From Swiss-Prot:
Keyword Transport tagged: no
Keywords: Cytoplasm, Ribosome biogenesis
Protein's recorded name: Ribosome-binding factor A
PANTHER family xref list: RIBOSOME-BINDING FACTOR A, CHLOROPLASTIC-RELATED
Annotated compartments: Cytoplasm
An individual GO BP term: maturation of SSU-rRNA
UniProt xrefs under InterPro entries: KH_dom-like_a/b, RbfA, RbfA_dom_sf, Ribosome-bd_factorA_CS
A GO term from the CC aspect: cytosol
Biological function: One of several proteins that assist in the late maturation steps of the functional core of the 30S ribosomal subunit. Associates with free 30S ribosomal subunits (but not with 30S subunits that are part of 70S ribosomes or polysomes). Required for efficient processing of 16S rRNA. May interact with the 5'-terminal helix region of 16S rRNA.
Gene: rbfA
Amino acid sequence: MANHRIDRVGMEIKREVNDILQKKVRDPRVQGVTITEVQMQGDLSLAKVYYTIMSDLASDNQKAQTGLEKATGTIKRELGKQLTMYKIPDLVFEKDNSIAYGNKIDQLLRELDKKD
């Protein structure tokens, strides 16, 4: 039963953080950032927030990470207004590499098809 609640809270945080980044955070470093997944710790005290950014440049990725870290307080405050939870979890932002990994596999599969 608890797993369903953890999943629901994670989905709600994902939706709200995406909305907050688009509407409330004005930092240009986080423009184009999309939240792809939120993994909650079992006691709901920590949320790992995975994000992607449209740019492949390492400098843009670093700027986005810095911008998200700077905006964490604003995001938590806005989450507190939107969610009915006793304690808003701490947020840790990590780059989601699964999309790049999937693109790499697609490219390898296409290369195999060309060889045949």
